[in-house]
Amino acid sequence: MGQTVTTPLSLTLQHWGDVQRIASNQSVDVKKRRWVTFCSAEWPTFNVGWPQDGTFNLGVISQVKSRVFCPGPHGHPDQVPYIVTWEALAYDPPPWVKPFVSPKPPPLPTAPVLPPGPSAQPPSRSALYPALTLSIKSKPPKPQVLPDSGGPLIDLLTEDPPPYGVQPSSSARENNEEEAATTSEVSPPSPMVSRLRGRRDPPAADSTTSQAFPLRMGGDGQLQYWPFSSSDLYNWKNNNPSFSEDPGKLTALIESVLITHQPTWDDCQQLLGTLLTGEEKQRVLLEAGKAVRGNDGRPTQLPNEVNAAFPLERPDWDYTTTEGRNHLVLYRQLLLAGLQNAGRSPTNLAKVKGITQGPNESPSAFLERLKEAYRRYTPYDPEDPGQETNVSMSFIWQSAPDIGRKLERLEDLKSKTLGDLVREAEKIFNKRETPEEREERIRREIEEKEERRRAEDEQRERERDRRRHREMSKLLATVVIGQRQDRQGGERRRPQLDKDQCAYCKEKGHWAKDCPKKPRGPRGPRPQTSLLTLGDXGGQGQEPPPEPRITLKVGGQPVTFLVDTGAQHSVLTQNPGPLSDKSAWVQGATGGKRYRWTTDRKVHLATGKVTHSFLHVPDCPYPLLGRDLLTKLKAQIHFEGSGAQVVGPMGQPLQVLTLNIENKYRLHETSKEPDVPLGSTWLSDFPQAWAETGGMGLAVRQAPLIIPLKATSTPVSIKQYPMSQEARLGIKPHIQRLLDQGILVPCQSPWNTPLLPVKKPGTNDYRPVQDLREVNKRVEDIHPTVPNPYNLLSGLPPSHQWYTVLDLKDAFFCLRLHPTSQPLFAFEWRDPEMGISGQLTWTRLPQGFKNSPTLFDEALHRDLADFRIQHPDLILLQYVDDLLLAATSEQDCQRGTRALLQTLGNLGYRASAKKAQICQKQVKYLGYLLKEGQRWLTEARKETVMGQPTPKTPRQLREFLGTAGFCRLWIPGFAEMAAPLYPLTKTGTLFNWGPDQQKAYQEIKQALLTAPALGLPDLTKPFELFVDEKQGYAKGVLTQKLGPWRRPVAYLSKKLDPVAAGWPPCLRMVAAIAVLTKDAGKLTMGQPLVILAPHAVEALVKQPPDRWLSNARMTHYQAMLLDTDRVQFGPVVALNPATLLPLPEKEAPHDCLEILAETHGTRPDLTDQPIPDADYTWYTDGSSFLQEGQRRAGAAVTTETEVIWARALPAGTSAQRAELIALTQALKMAEGKKLNVYTDSRYAFATAHVHGEIYRRRGLLTSEGREIKNKNEILALLKALFLPKRLSIIHCPGHQKGNSAEARGNRMADQAAREAAMKAVLETSTLLIEDSTPYTPPHFHYTETDLKRLRELGATYNQTKGYWVLQGKPVMPDQSVFELLDSLHRLTHPSPQKMKALLDREESPYYMLNRDRTIQYVTETCTACAQVNASKAKIGAGVRVRGHRPGTHWEVDFTEVKPGLYGYKYLLVFVDTFSGWVEAFPTKRETAKVVTKKLLEDIFPRFGMPQVLGSDNGPAFASQVSQSVADLLGIDWKLHCAYRPQSSGQVERMNRTIKETLTKLTLASGTRDWVLLLPLALYRARNTPGPHGLTPYEILYGAPPPLVNFHDPEMSKLTNSPSLQAHLQALQAVQQEVWKPLAAAYQDQLDQPVIPHPFRVGDAVWVRRHQTKNLEPRWKGPYTVLLTTPTALKVDGISAWIHAAHVKAATTPPAGTAWKVQRSQNPLKIRLTRGAP
């Protein structure tokens, strides 16, 4: 238990600081959270073997790196810094990584060389691969085709063309005729091929063996190695689709390469690695291994045979032999077989169906795409006649909609071939209407539709007018007839009642309210609401439809449908929610119209319950139940005398359920049975008590609540926060329900608070929560009377073991709010569908109001008071809305539960039937599990604590301690266990989670898992409290007798306050008993308590030592512990540390009073009475007073007549501090003597006698836990108390006027202290108190070097005093000078000049030997100064390397141009270092993709491929994409030093020139379009003379740019272009007269000596931090120099080169220096110093 496994990921997290430092050295930045995410979740998905816990295997890291750096959309550029840092950790592991890194394998040779083998026999010829053999004789060296790069340039006109290849000599053919016959067919490579392949010197080995392989026949018949060039691989990769997209094409390419190039095993791996991904390569190798056949010709699975034919590791085949070449031929054949098998993708008809014809795509082009999809995603050949039908059907179905519909209507479609279908489709495609025709047709249709609509509206208006006339006529006729009947028959009214006649029984003598015949008693229960059918109308303001009708639940709302067998589809008239895009044409009596369908919510149920998609017809008079839904229901309609009845197929009533699609899963869920199912009788017998049957509750006996405001309160109005559509729709049903129930009403109020939608965990449901914090601040506070759950269960006796738990539903809503208080809780709500736009407020007590729990708890308690009186044998506990009823038997519990439910129903409260626990012996209440008179922690409570992750912040730690603290009664010693965690919760404390915190965290969780069962407190029995104390922590267990055993009731623990923690053990036990007795009182409820402890503390409490306890604390302890009616002390017992219960054997008791008497003082013989035979009797005093606004202080030690010691103290010293200093000085001067010392300071006297020892035990802390004042002086006094042989410190009154010895001595000491305070302060240190004896210099030790130097300076030696004297001062030796100056420098780290000025200003009594040299050495070797101080290093100017001809050496850089225009914000600048020619391209992004695109599309076609590129370390240049492209093209990309723009000086200066020119042009032209003005800026840059007087244009083209006057009439003469020969002659002249002299001049600059920097290999240097944070040193290191150049350094630990101007030398102390130990002011600390040599 407690052990953890260290993984690479956890190791890096433990050393995260080192990881960040290594990442910074790699010029990247990493974050811990993303580090963990990539390692544990992202990289394992690459399927390259990366484990979730990380690895330091370089092979796996390189595979992950290749995936991360993959170009295009498959790459992961955001993961580049993290994998680069992983690789740096594994490649150059720090000490904490080395044990986890496997040793590196020996490096493989970069160029494989064949060992000399035996002479090969003439091989047999192969039909596929021609056999090539080695020549026996050596051939002469081949003539050089291309000139040397360092030689002179080629004369393009005079030089002869390069020679062609030389044919093999005749002697070679004579020596081996067969070989000659074989090789005659293979011609030597052409010069162009040689140029593309690269120049290589001929092998220097013996001509009988081949030093390079694979297998290219040279001119002399010898096999030579011609590897794949980077351009070949690049072209194959980019000009062909990937293997996953088109495996056939890539397989054909590889097959042709294998035949024509005859690659070796290594070249095959290189080819596969370039053209295939890692997964594709593995699949090919696996399929190739399956194709290996055994001796019987069948595929074999024997590993030895498979590895022999198709090895996965590099084999040792000798290609000079026939056997080796045969192995290679077989390997290529198997590789081709693997490619073909791996390329067979599985059948995926979904991909084929996804190929559809485009809007403007021709049918023939679509057919070709369809066939290609068949070839790629299916094993079928679309050209096969057997597949023509499938292809034809796909062509018809996936064609454009208009073409497909017409093709489906073709006659005799089965007999049509695919060609016929394509021809028909072409005809349809060509006859499509043009866009103009289509617009004209749509316009005509719209006009016709509008015309029909107007005619229908006019007809409808005429019909409406005629109907109104007929109805008015009928109404008038009815009125006339009614008047006639009235006149004939008179009025028919209810007979008038007499004054004393009852309206109910019509008898006289009483009224209706007093009628005895009228039924009395409570109103009967309301009829139970049907969950599926309602008899209401179908909508607001709408009469119910005629019979037959059925009421269904649609979207949570009841809707009454008219059963209409004539309707084909069921219809809804109200808005049913979201509608689908589908619509249908509905033809009715009044005409036809198109209506939309509701969203598809169909769910078929075997029970007859269905959901349905309805047609939304707002114009329909009634919702209709059509034939579609009646058919699915298998409904039966019976016509009887009472009317039509609609029932199911078995005669049962129909039940139709409509719900949203997201709730469909609930239909398939199995109902979760409760622990004890609530019987239906409880629901039916008490319908008014349950929320499920009684509706919303209302407390009928409670008056509306008035919420009083504070006197200074003003209305607060906070706008509603933005709310998402999902959240608004989620809380909308709740708002609607509360509006319907009258709990919410519209209002207008100056108060407004926001509504917050809170998502319920695990569901998509939201509930509205109102933010009432501002309202709570303005409402008067009331005293909370909610019970404390800590001691609530103390009122539950263990004898009551039958329980009922009820949870009131929407309890706060049962209390009404007074209308005057309702505006306080208003909030905004808008619902256009309901017509609500404004404020709503609560008519009931809202949730979130701070006084709601107290108000409801008091109201319910008052309402249930009668129930408690009527049932005294039952126990009813109430915590707000949670009720617990306990009884002794099941019958009493059922009887009491029935009475409680009846009472709740009558009072208007509603309980939740889902959460009810009725008459059970085991229930859950307030997070506890109650059973058989005991309580446990519930599993949910334990899982809550166990499920919390390791805290990372103080807030998370506080949450954990709060959750675990709820369970502290079950954890013995919880306070001591959690002690390491509490300091991290303080504000402003650094959160440092260490091993101690982790151990405490795990111990709390482990203790929670083993939490015991605690008995419920029985208030009829006495309690016993066992108490123990250890290291300032009180621990105890509260028990009660259960037969012969003690049953734990609670485990108590608490930390003592700092004052009590500093007491002796016996007094700490008193404090522990007092603390735990107070906590136990919350559970015992004032019952008798017996305290048992290992100390006899009762005597201590009755007679406490006044020196340790204050009067207030003493009174508090006595009042609590000496209450004999409630607290009694038992016998002294020895406790078990684990259980805190008594042990069988007892230890010998001790007397606490004796122990306190022995430990109350600091020195046992210290007394306050004069010693008769004292050697000295001294008087001490300290003085502190204000004079001229400055506080002066002094201290003195005197006798009655003379001053022994007096000293002025620093300004601001207090009188108490001065008294301590004086008393301490007296004790030091009386070392080894008998001393009587008098002081008039109560503070110094009490510190020496009493408080000093208390402070020492308490850790020098006050009672509030703060550090005491005068800490150093008190420590010095406590130390000096033991110096005299015998000591008596006596207190005497101050400022006495008598003539006694005490009075004279005190006055003398007071006068001496005041006089000393008036003098100048010589020393500021108050702890280095000097002796009263005269000053004598210390004894110096001079070395031989010191003596030699002293003799040279003319110093004299003082024989009497034993030291050398120079200039009248004692000479301090070199070593002592170093120690003094080193201590002085470390105080404030001044500069050498400041130290010299300080020493010159202060007159030193010594002559310091070699002072200036030592000061310089101390400041140079100070590590803090070296890391912070700036450096003034001056480095000489270097020489920039330039190209030897145009286009070979470029510098590139990005520069930002503001303001951006058309999205162009950056300018990519290329500068040719030879000519100064500049190319600039405006770009929108500063990325590596832009750099490579411009390089390949602009620079390369115009100037050729560069040999060298220089740039800074920007992300676009240092990225893997740019560097990989440069490596592939053979470009040497030089990254300049970081933060050194001078390294890219040419391109940086060009950036400035371009931007300055653009600024001038924009000002002159008045336009901001710098992109338009860029060519003019480039023209100026290209035609500005350089340092040699030539412009870049002249250097490149050999002549100035042509300047043409377009107004010159002779301009036509200038348009004649010179011939090609003239151009070449001019180019030759440029080469001879310009390029060669410039190249020579640049070379001369390189040959000139450059003053290098002073750093050498092996030096230690500090490296500058270019980005420093607050309080972070300016320099980092020191680092060791590994490599140097004239201007840069390479140091150990940083990958990039560093410019010499960014480092400074680190002075390290010599190895011969010795360490010395020095004392410090703190007696618990020492100082280690190292002196100068």
Curated annotation (Swiss-Prot):
CDD domains: RNase_HI_RT_Bel, RP_RTVL_H_like, RT_ZFREV_like. Its EC number is 3.4.23.-, 2.7.7.49, 2.7.7.7, 3.1.26.4. Residues 526-535 have a biased composition (Low complexity). Mg(2+) 1 binds at residues 807, 881-882. Residues 139-218, 449-497, 511-549 are annotated as: Disordered. The keyword Ubl conjugation applies. Mg(2+) 3 binds at residues 1181, 1219, 1240. One of its GO terms (cellular component) is host cell plasma membrane. GO terms for molecular function: aspartic-type endopeptidase activity; DNA binding; DNA-directed DNA polymerase activity; RNA binding; RNA-directed DNA polymerase activity; RNA-DNA hybrid ribonuclease activity; structural constituent of virion; zinc ion binding. This is Gag-Pol polyprotein. It comes from Xenotropic MuLV-related virus (isolate VP35).
